[in-house]
From Swiss-Prot:
Lineage: Eukaryota, Metazoa, Chordata, Craniata, Vertebrata
Chain positions covered by the region annotation Interaction with RBPJ/RBPSUH: 128-156
Motif (Nuclear localization signal): 92-108
Protein's GO biological process: negative regulation of Notch signaling pathway; neurogenesis; Notch signaling pathway; nuclear export
Family to which the UniProt record says this protein belongs: Belongs to the RITA family.
Keywords carried by this UniProt record: Cytoplasm, Cytoskeleton, Neurogenesis, Notch signaling pathway, Nucleus
Pfam family, one: RITA
Coiled coil: none
Location (main, coarse): cytoplasm
Localisation: Cytoplasm; Nucleus; Cytoplasm, Cytoskeleton, Microtubule organizing center, Centrosome
Compositionally biased tracts (Polar residues): 62-77
Protein name: RBPJ-interacting and tubulin-associated protein 1
């Protein structure tokens, strides 16, 4: 019988051996193309690392003194290296302490107010800023969020209503937007078709049940006498579908804007 090391070198005979004996499932029995000596042999023992004095022994030597520390280290290990190391350590320790002290006193360039308010109070100034800059920075933290919300609040409400205007006469969906636009803007030409659409929407709600559209027309178009006449005529005509009503109302509104322009074709399509 071959040893598992020889089987690992051959690589071909390892497969039947893995099925025969259970001990072949280890790394040695497998055919590996890596030099396994890099990971260390399990049978051989690694060389023990050299003995070093723990940190608490060095601290005891520092407190007692350099002479006593060298005598203890030489008695424990019996080597000259420990005496030289223990004698050289006191020169390095004060440098480490000085480094830590310098780190604690170094100025930081981050805004320390994020971690909490300073006990000094209103002292926002740094060594690189002037006194006037510190006051400006303190005031800027609060002024921007308060002013734009109050001043610019009505403007975004009006802009979407103006964008809905071209689609207003052809669709019956933006009814609420047309009512709010009627109250907000009075001197523009755009409210005229919107107010007619409002009257048309009221007739839409009342016509299918009552069958008399002219009764609701005078209520909405009361302040205007000459203009409700064409809309009233178109509503009195015998129509069945609500789409036809919307078309008939939109037709007289377009010639009033432009005398010779004819725009009844897009709604019919």
């Amino acid at each position: 019988m071959k040893t598992p090391v020889e089987l690992a070198v051959s690589g071909i005979q390892t497969l039947p051996l893995q099925h025969r004996c259970r001990g072949s499932h280890r790394v040695k029995a497998r055919a590996s193309y890596v030099d396994e000596s890099l990971f260390g042999s399990p049978a051989g023992t690694r060389p023990t690392p050299p003995d070093f004095d723990p940190p608490w022994v060095e601290k005891a030597n520092r407190t007692s003194g350099v002479g006593t520390g060298t005598s203890r280290a030489s008695g424990a290990n019996g080597s000259c290296e420990t005496t030289s190391s223990s004698g050289s350590t006191p020169t390095l320790t004060p440098r480490k302490k000085n480094k830590y002290r310098l780190i604690s006193h170094t100025p930081s360039y981050c805004d320390e107010s994020l971690f909490g308010s300073r006990p000094e109070g209103t002292n926002w100034e740094g060594p690189w800023m002037a006194k006037g800059d510190a006051a400006k920075l303190h005031s800027l933290f609060w002024t921007p969020p308060a002013t734009p919300r109050g001043s610019h609040s009505p403007r975004p409400r009006e802009t979407p209503l103006r964008a809905i205007h071209p689609a207003g006469p052809s669709k019956t969906e933006p009814k609420v937007a047309a009512d709010s636009q009627k109250l907000s803007t009075d001197g523009l030409d755009s409210p005229h078709p919107l107010r007619r659409e409002r009257s048309h929407s009221l007739t839409h709600l009342n016509v299918p049940r009552t069958g008399r559209p002219p009764t609701s027309g005078p209520h909405t178009n009361g302040p205007r006498d000459p203009r409700p006449s064409p809309s009233g005529v178109t509503l009195q005509s015998p129509l069945v579908t609500p789409r036809a009503r919307s078309v008939r109302i939109s037709v007289p509104a377009t010639p009033q804007r432009g005398g010779a322009t004819q725009k009844p074709k897009p709604p019919w399509k």
